[in-house]
Amino acid sequence: MRRVAIVLVCLAVIIVGAACYFYLHRTGPVPPAALGNAPPLVSLLPPQAPLIIYADVASLRKSAFLERLVALIPAPAEDPEYSEFVRATGFDYSRDLNSVAVAIYSTSPHPTIWAIAEGHFDQQRITAYALRTGKSGQRDGRTVYVIPNSQGGGNMVLSFLTPDRIELINNPNGGSQVSTLMPMSDVNGSAMKERISNVAGSSVFAVARMDAVPKDMDLGSVNLEQVATFLQNVQWLSLSAVPAEQNLKVVLEGKCDSTIHAANLQLALQGFKFMGRAMLSQASVRKQFTPEGAAALTRLIGEIDISRGNQSVALTATFSPELLAGLAAPTPQQQQRPPVKTPTNPGKANH
């Protein structure tokens, strides 16, 4: 069931990539977003964070869309490390995770991630697993478990907020006070709260303050430096997704700093759309995809709808499982690539 996570990650990359490259030239009112109050988990995160992501995993798990999509995606090879984690803790996210909210801070050399998850947890087994390499302590009146990060230094801090809620902070710099990451401006996080309220009714959403996104960050195969000029006047980016029977409705909205820049964004997207159509008409380009992938990409270009409000530009698309499966299909080069053999090293069996 690790396919569920792979599907969600691929979905996010596909939607944002589509926003950068394709545009259906039509203007009109921006479609109504899935308004609502912030989910309880999101309310526990600092609203000053530059990037907040939320997923109602339980509702997605029950949706006909995800059930059909998972059936179309080949199962990945079993991860021995994850299998050991499930055996030791009794926790399998595909079964036990109900919802998760994540705040991400752009820190160097790696981002700081603050996550709160809700689900079914065996506190005794998870605590024992954390103490294999970590140690316990007290912070803000509750027990925390500080675990050294084996990759990139720093540590992870785990704590139980309630029996069914876990907080996990991955701090690559090893500091204990995440509050030092809070910006002095917008102390109450009112701007982020407003943007979240516009998408809070969605099963999955992400809101990013664009001035805090590193320009050298990679998004799939796209480096943001390549589209820095394209996005320089976008202040906020919001992504929301809601299952609709066997499909998934996705809205990507960019809020610009002026009406003129919103209009310019339309023109830029229109240019990318025409360029994408022209490229996909070339046999040399289409052969880089499977027939299913090329057909899905061509269909995606034609189905994306755009609307513009005063300072906002919104892209809306309805994805069927078959369309996403085609977009996620491996390229011919990936299909021909021989499997990578992982060298065994008995001396490093335990990390």
Stretches found by the model and what they are:
Residues 2-9, 13-153, 196-228, 267-301, ...:
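Structural boundary/hinge residues at secondary-structure and domain interfaces
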Residues 51-53, 113-117, 235-239, 246-254, ...:
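One face of beta-strands
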Residues 53, 156-172, 300, 304-308, ...:
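An acidic-aromatic pocket/loop used at catalytic or ligand-binding sites
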Residues 104-108, 138-139, 159-161, 241-243, ...:
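Generic beta-strand structural signal
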Residues 110, 121, 140, 159-166, ...:
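Short, solvent-exposed coil/turn segments at beta-strand boundaries
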Residues 119-122, 171-174, 257-261, 319-322:
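Helix N-cap motif at beta-to-alpha junctions
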Residues 154-214:
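A conserved glycine-rich beta-strand in the N-terminal activation segment of trypsin-fold
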Residues 207-268:
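A contiguous, surface-oriented mixed alpha/beta subdomain in the mid-to-C-terminal portion of proteins
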